[in-house]
Every structure is written in C-alpha cells, then in structure tokens.
C-alpha cells in the first residue's frame, strides 16, 4: 500500500504540486487588504494542487519514450511499463484539470479559474509538448506555471492584478530557471543521452554558470521589491537571508564549477523559496 502511494505521488509530482499550492496561498495573503476567507483560499490551493498533479502526470505520460534513456527517470512507471500508456490516461488527466478549474471558479471567481487552467496548460502543453525537446530556453517559459499559481491565489482576494501579487509572480518566474538549470547541470549527461537541449547541454559549463548567476541576481533583486510596497521586516529578513545564501552558492558555482556546487545551488534555491513563501504567508497573519 505504501509503495503504491509513493508511486502515485511520484507520477503526479505531488511535491511540485504542494509547492504550487503554497504559492497560491502566498499569493492570496500577499494581496493588500483584509486577510481573505480561509475556505476559498484553501479551495483554490487544492485546485492548483490538482491541476499541477494532472500536468505532472501528463509529463510522465508524454515522456515515456525518453525516460528510459535517463538514469534519473528510467524507473518511472510509464517508462517501465508498470502503467499502461493507454488513451484513458490523457482523458482522465484532462477531466482532473477541468474539475480543478471548476473548483476554482465555484470557490472563488473566473480569474482564479483562468490562472489555474493556464498554470496546467503552460507546464503540460507549452513546456512538456512544445518546448522541452526543441529549445534550451524551455524552462524559462515553463516557469510561468508557478507564476500562475500565485495569481490564482491572489485572485481569491482581489480579482484584478495588484503590484504585490505581480511581484511575487515575477519572483516565481525568475526562481525556476536557476533552480532547474542547477539540477540540469548536475544531470547534464542524462539530458544529453535523451537528446533534450537543456541549457547545460547546449552551452559550455562556464557560460551556463554565468547565466545561472545572472538570473539569480535578477531573482534576488526582484524578491526585495515588496519592501517598497509595505512588506514587513519578517519578509525582508527572509528575502535577504534566503537570497543572500542563494547568491553566495551561485557565485561559488561560477568560481568552483562541478556537480557538487550545482547541487548546492539547487538546494539553496529551495531554501530561498521556502523562506520567502513562509514569510509571505505568516507575516499578514501576525499583523492580524
């Protein structure tokens, strides 16, 4: 039973889905004004989780031909044949996405539903189907899926786009490339074997690491912008601490390149995101 649950959690990429759901909650709480009602925020967060899970499972389904070529993915259920890749899978995942969009529309409004749909569409179709095997900049556009999670949550509080929610969406957009490129650097041989043109595959190590550093600088700078829109000391401290650590590890990656440094940068990106989202969610609650 436990093994089956682990397989399903892997196929539906629930860890990514949980991060997206937290981003949606953060988006709702980052929007100025009174703290929104608990029920619609949680409903939209669930909708984001479900739509992200559907997109993640579709990613597994679509990439079943190349996953066996990569050490990291060769044991995925679709790659091994543990799950039969019949037509019911995409139909079921489409139905799950429709249900998630309907939940957001019912619990909040049409804007929240639109952002839930766009997040799933960008990851499942734009990134997975259209871009991943064609361009090294695939993950740059794919990073919009996290931004739409923020905007879905923000729409619960205020359907129109606020500067605060747009800045947080920008932070998620800028966070994704250096996060994923760091992992791709460590797994460069896997992506090369599968013929996927990730940035570390098509660019030199030096060029890739400099691009990661430049993106991290832009990310850290954008994460400080909420200070000009009323963000409190908790958020500012989290942004400085998490951003400073991520920036330090990105500089280290440029100076001492290698797999160990790349994974260190990857984990630094996770620390930064956790600190930022936690601060965004906690600070409004402490303020009452």
From Swiss-Prot:
It is found in: Cell inner membrane. It is an enzyme of class 2 (transferase). One of its GO terms (molecular function) is protoheme IX farnesyltransferase activity. The chain crosses the membrane at residues 16-36, 38-58, 88-108, 111-131, 139-159, 166-186, 227-247, 266-286. Its EC number is 2.5.1.141. Its main location: membrane. Signal peptide: none annotated. Converts heme B (protoheme IX) to heme O by substitution of the vinyl group on carbon 2 of heme B porphyrin ring with a hydroxyethyl farnesyl side group. HAMAP family: CyoE_CtaB. Belongs to the UbiA prenyltransferase family. Protoheme IX farnesyltransferase subfamily. NCBIfam families: cyoE_ctaB. This is Protoheme IX farnesyltransferase 2. The gene is ctaB2.
């Amino acid at each position: 039973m436990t093994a089956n649950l682990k397989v399903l959690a892997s196929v539906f990429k629930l860890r990514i889905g949980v991060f997206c759901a937290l981003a949606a909650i953060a988006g709702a709480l980052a929007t100025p004004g009174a703290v929104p009602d608990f029920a619609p925020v949680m409903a939209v967060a669930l909708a984001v989780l479900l739509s992200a899970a559907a997109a993640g499972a579709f990613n597994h389904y679509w990439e079943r031909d190349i996953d066996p070529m990569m050490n990291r993915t060769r044991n995925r259920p679709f790659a091994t044949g543990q799950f039969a890749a019949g037509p019911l899978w995409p139909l079921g995942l489409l139905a799950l996405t429709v249900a998630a969009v309907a939940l957001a529309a019912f619990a909040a409004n049409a804007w929240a539903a639109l952002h839930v749909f766009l997040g799933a569409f960008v990851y499942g179709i734009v990134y997975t189907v259209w871009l991943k095997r064609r361009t090294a900049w695939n993950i740059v556009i794919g990073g919009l899926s996290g931004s739409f999670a923020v905007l879905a949550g923000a729409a619960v509080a205020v359907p129109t786009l606020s500067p605060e929610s747009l800045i947080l969406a920008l932070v998620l957009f800028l966070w994704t490339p250096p996060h994923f490129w760091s992992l791709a650097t460590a797994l460069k041989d896997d992506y090369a074997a599968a013929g996927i043109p990730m940035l570390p595959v098509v660019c030199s190590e030096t060029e890739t690491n400099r691009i990661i550093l430049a993106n991290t600088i832009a990310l850290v700078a954008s994460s400080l912008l909420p200070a000009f829109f009323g963000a409190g000391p908790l958020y500012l401290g989290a942004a400085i601490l998490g951003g400073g650590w991520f920036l330090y590890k990105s500089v280290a990656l440029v100076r001492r390149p290698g797999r160990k440094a790349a994974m260190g940068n990857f984990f630094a990106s996770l620390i930064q995101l956790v600190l930022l989202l936690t601060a965004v969610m906690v600070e409004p609650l402490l303020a009452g």
